[in-house]
């Protein structure tokens, strides 16, 4: 990208002043930068890989360049929050496609990498990962936009931005409980399954399968306190102990997220569904 400049002069003589014509020129920038995330989506706690590519259209090597990445910094209630945490020692450095020794990481928030070089007519790529933290928006339609700036003596500063969006999907976890843990022969036991959704989207297609051992008889199943009907809501093979819910019967609501007004950190309350199966052994 070129920067245009204009200039004109004045000439004074005998109490008079005349103005020259205006001349126009341009300064062609030789340094270019792009920034790309390997994936378009993020999930809190999972690293995002970024590639920053520098190009040199000039005939002279560019050296002693500095990269600064704001890691998605944004303002919340008057405070600057940084939703990405640079992953230590993750930097990879390529010059004209060849992997070379990693440059110096002079700071991590903002991420500052010094001593970069771009050969004449060539390119340099800096690859690193950063992990969304407690300040990264987790809800549907959340985004992180971060800006990288390249600076160097005698050069016009150049910038590039990249935006990644939340991965809108359920994230299920399940725990199983038994009560009582000690029971007499022909006694009754109760299995409790708690299914939690830490994702930002409801789960509508969960299927729970369990082979009860010892096998149960006369089973009763409830979902969130509502009785389930054998054959319609679940199947059970008394000969093998195999219990399976019908697809679509179990739904788990999305998690809810709250951003602390003071710290700006998000907290997660998972959506939850409880399945209880009771039977005799």
Q: What do the predicted segments below correspond to?
A:
Residues 1-281:
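Exported/extracytosolic protein signature
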């Amino acid at each position: 990208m070129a920067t245009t400049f204009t200039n004109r002069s004045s000439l004074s003589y005998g109490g008079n002043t005349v103005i020259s014509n205006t001349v126009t020129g341009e300064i062609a920038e030789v340094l270019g930068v792009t920034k790309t995330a390997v994936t378009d989506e993020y999930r809190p706690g999972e690293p995002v890989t970024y590639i920053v590519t520098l190009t040199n259209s000039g005939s002279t090597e560019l050296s002693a360049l500095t990269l600064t990445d704001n890691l998605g910094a944004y303002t919340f209630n008057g405070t600057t929050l940084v939703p990405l945490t640079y992953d230590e020692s993750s930097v990879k450095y390529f010059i004209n496609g060849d992997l070379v020794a990693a440059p110096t990481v002079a700071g991590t928030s903002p991420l500052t990498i010094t001593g970069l070089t771009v050969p004449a007519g060539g390119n340099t790529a800096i690859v690193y990962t950063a992990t969304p933290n407690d300040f990264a928006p987790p809800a549907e339609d959340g985004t992180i936009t971060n800006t990288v700036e390249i600076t160097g003596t005698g050069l016009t500063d150049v910038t590039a931005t990249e935006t990644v969006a939340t991965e809108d999907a359920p994230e299920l976890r399940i725990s199983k409980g038994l009560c009582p843990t000690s029971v007499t022969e022909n006694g009754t036991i109760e299995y409790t399954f708690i299914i939690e959704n830490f994702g930002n989207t409801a789960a509508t297609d969960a299927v729970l399968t369990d082979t009860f051992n010892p096998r149960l008889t006369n089973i009763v199943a409830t979902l969130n306190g509502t009785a389930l009907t054998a054959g319609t809501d679940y199947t059970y093979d008394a000969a093998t102990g195999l219990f399976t819910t019908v697809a679509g019967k179990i739904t788990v609501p999305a998690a809810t997220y709250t951003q602390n007004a003071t710290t700006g950190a998000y907290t997660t309350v998972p959506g939850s569904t409880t399945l209880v199966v009771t039977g005799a052994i």
